[in-house]
Amino acid sequence: MTFLAPRTYLEWRTNGTDRAEDAAYAFGKDLIVHCRDEVLSTLAPDVPEATRAVVQAAVDTALHNVLDMLEGFWRLPSGPQHSLEYVLQVRVRDASGTIVESQEIAPCKLDLPIGYWKWARDREFR
């Protein structure tokens, strides 16, 4: 399967929203390759297609729900007077390990749950 690779850091666009989107695409590629693909690769080659489809759907639902949670789709109570919010930030480090840029991509920045399907189904990271 072919995929459209995300831009490298030096190729990120300069507009603020576009730059955050480029960071999100980098995250999306890593989520798909290191989480989704890694799990699906553990299935034996002779697993029936119906079983493979059920496992793939379960993995997609779980990862999509993580993105929903990061986007603030659900209220996450922490006692009677407080709630929680999870934040996803992409940090770029140079060769020496120094942070050169940070982009907050969730919550409520780029609609990651919609992006998930583009990443998982189309392998498109731009």
Please report, for each region that a protein language model flagged, where it lies by residue.
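Low-complexity, compositionally biased segments
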Residues: 21, 25, 33, 63, ...
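N-terminal low-complexity, intrinsically disordered segments
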Residues: 1-53, 80-82
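Mature extracytoplasmic domains of secretory-pathway proteins
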Residues: 45-68
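Acidic, proline/glycine-rich low-complexity IDRs
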Residues: 2-10, 36-37, 41, 73-126
